Amino acid sequence: MAKGKFERTKPHVNVGTIGHVDHGKTTLTAAITTILSKKFGGEAKAYDQIDAAPEEKARGITINTAHVEYETATRHYAHVDCPGHADYVKNMITGAAQMDGAILVCSAADGPMPQTREHILLARQVGVPYIIVFLNKCDMVDDEELLELVEMEVRELLSKYDFPGDDIPIVKGSALKALEGDQSDIGEPAIFRLADALDSYIPTPERAIDKPFLLPIEDVFSISGRGTVVTGRVERGIVKVGEEIEIVGIKPTVKTTCTGVEMFRKLLDQGQAGDNVGVLLRGTKREDVERGQVLCKPGSITPHTHFTGEIYVLSKEEGGRHTPFFNNYRPQFYFRTTDVTGSISLPEGTEMVMPGDNVSITVKLIAPIAMEEGLRFAIREGGRTVGAGVVAKIIE
């Protein structure tokens, strides 16, 4: 049977479930696909189909992730759910599944637990912009006051990590009851309330093509009589012939003009997000540009050396280090297309970092990189990946 054609008529939004183990993330995911597919079409997925999440690799790290999709009246959602806590940590840090918003699942019977807290912190660190709460297992709590107490706790926890705890939509329900077709307030109607909250609270993400132009430079050539050409894949935005652009990173920032865009040996008047192009630069010498720099819209991104980040350190089984590392560890940081050496400072009270851990760190690079919060990187030793990370805050 052929899969239904993917209709691009509705805007596309990426979401995922986060929260403590056994609070009902996978059951909720199954309930959403089951109930929304009845009303808007799409494919219902059973719990065990989602729970048997396939392995995938992101930046050399193996992650188990289940991908489902569903529709609401106004949108198409791609939704990720992970079976284990470690998978969430890896997923969020590597950005394997970028989330425009997250659904925090919290059991009303248990209240916030350690991983509830950790996932909120991770969401903050890796730049998940919006969180919606599904207060699950409400059928197990008879006391209305207890429900209110748990809701208050969750709101306080969100505020503590700089999310707008007072304004975040909290939907009360029971994913299991909804899956069973229960029509009471906490059954199927709760899933529709959640869908409405997703539609109204998470803004439609800006498309890559509408963002300011950025192209990570992969190669540089000199073409006699024409000048210098840099090649790479346009990450976002559009570059038009005749536009002023900047070369940022590694060396001092310089301005130049795009005098030509080439794709598959054909001349174009512009290159856009997703295109693999060659960009001809006016008056730029071959030796003034190198792999690891970026071409960008002037002023849209700046070079930095000093930042805080959240990293996941590969375990020995994943091909990572066999031993811990300590303060002032100096690996290479692989940003976009190149390695830059940097030193790591660990948080106070953290003596060392073991393979398989995740930790907040401060990094000082020996050369500046075009950087913004949310940028992903790999940590490498002699060309082999030993960790993955994301820029949380730029210091300078």
Swiss-Prot record:
The keyword Signal does not apply. It is an enzyme of class 3 (hydrolase). Residues 60-64 are annotated as: G2. GTP binds at residues 19-26, 81-85, 136-139. SUPFAM superfamilies: EF-Tu/eEF-1alpha/eIF2-gamma C-terminal domain, P-loop containing nucleoside triphosphate hydrolases, Translation proteins. Keywords: Cytoplasm, Elongation factor, GTP-binding, Hydrolase, Magnesium, Metal-binding, Nucleotide-binding, Protein biosynthesis. Transmembrane segments: none annotated. Its EC number is 3.6.5.3. Residues 10-206 form the tr-type G domain. Pfam families: GTP_EFTU, GTP_EFTU_D2, GTP_EFTU_D3. Its main location: cytoplasm. PANTHER family: ELONGATION FACTOR TU, MITOCHONDRIAL, ELONGATION FACTOR TU-RELATED. This is Elongation factor Tu. It comes from Azoarcus sp. (strain BH72).
